[in-house]
């Protein structure tokens, strides 16, 4: 005959067993309301820890790999929601079109979504066109100088705040700016140093300036009000940083030489 203590213990175990699926269902309802984990990504040949690329079979990138693994842990399929840049992802945050994303964080975006752990810290600078006489920030920040940035991004806002005389113009895609820089129609392009170093290899005569005007931090994010989802993605990224999953995602996407930088 069971003792009262054993009866109480058995009751608690049974209650926990019943409650756990309910908690899991509640999380899935919030983080994957369509039955799929909709991962917002931005497409660009720039690569790096934020951008994804289009491939013959689908998409590749650090957010692509992390989204696939997150969906597997939740037990749901993954669906990639494609955007041209992080500004478009931000604009869609309140429209219910995506569930999770990885993108650069700044105070303006914190009013539109909730951020989890930072997994990348990048140095933002400028690349100047072939044949340019610009050698540093002082010679760049002059009247008549045309600087491009990807529209409505953290880097664009940083460049506008940094440059007092040069004119900063936003464009929708990396590809468009690449063409303008190559043809000499713009004087400079603001982006993270690692991506600009790759661009410099593709456009002979360009030069990446030595100085840094902004530290850009990239983190996982969910829409406002999704507290259960935020708790889940926070644990996911904390685990991914310590168990090698994030390192593997970097290595699989041509970032073997890039360190994982957190706050």
Question: Language-model segments: what does each one mean?
Answer:
Residues 41-46, 57-73, 105, 125-178, ...:
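Bilobed "Venus flytrap"/periplasmic-binding protein-like clamshell domains
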Residues 68, 72, 77-141, 207:
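Acidic, polar ligand-binding/catalytic clefts
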Residues 25-26, 154-171, 208-209, 238-263:
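Ligand-binding clefts/hinges and TM-proximal coupling segments of bilobed small-molecule sensing domains
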Residues 25-104:
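Extracytoplasmic small-molecule ligand-binding "clamshell" domains
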Residues 80-91, 135, 154, 169-179, ...:
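Short helix-initiation/N-cap motifs at beta->coil->alpha
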Residues 87, 104-112, 158, 182-214:
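A ligand-binding cleft/hinge motif common to bilobed small-molecule-binding domains
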Residues 61-73, 138, 152-153, 219-258:
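Extended ligand-binding regions for polar small-molecule ligands
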Residues 43, 121-131, 193, 197-238, ...:
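Periplasmic-binding protein-like
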């Amino acid at each position: 005959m069971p003792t009262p203590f054993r009866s109480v213990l058995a009751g608690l175990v049974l209650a926990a067993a019943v409650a756990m699926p309910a908690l899991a269902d509640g999380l899935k309802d919030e983080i994957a309301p369509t039955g799929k984990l909709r991962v917002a990504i931005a497409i660009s040949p720039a690569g790096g820890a934020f951008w994804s690329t289009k491939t013959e079979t689908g998409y590749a990138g650090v957010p692509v790999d992390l989204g696939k693994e997150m969906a597997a842990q939740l037990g749901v399929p993954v669906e990639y929601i494609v955007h041209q840049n992080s500004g478009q992802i931000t604009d869609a945050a309140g429209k219910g079109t995506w569930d999770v994303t990885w993108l650069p964080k700044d105070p303006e975006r914190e009013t539109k979504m909730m951020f989890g752990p930072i997994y990348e810290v990048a140095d933002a600078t400028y690349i100047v066109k072939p044949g340019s006489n610009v050698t540093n920030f002082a010679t760049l920040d002059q009247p008549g100088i045309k600087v491009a940035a990807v529209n409505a991004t953290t880097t664009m806002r940083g460049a506008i705040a940094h440059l007092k005389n040069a004119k900063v113009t936003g464009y929708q895609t990396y590809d468009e700016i690449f063409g303008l820089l190559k043809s000499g129609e713009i004087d400079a392009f603001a982006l993270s140093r690692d991506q600009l170093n790759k661009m410099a290899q593709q456009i002979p005569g360009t030069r990446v300036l030595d100085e840094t005007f902004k530290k850009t931090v990239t983190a996982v994010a969910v829409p406002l009000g999704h507290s259960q989802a935020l708790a889940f993605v926070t644990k996911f990224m904390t685990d991914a940083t310590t168990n090698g999953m994030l390192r593997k995602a970097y290595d699989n996407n041509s970032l073997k030489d890039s360190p994982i930088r957190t706050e």
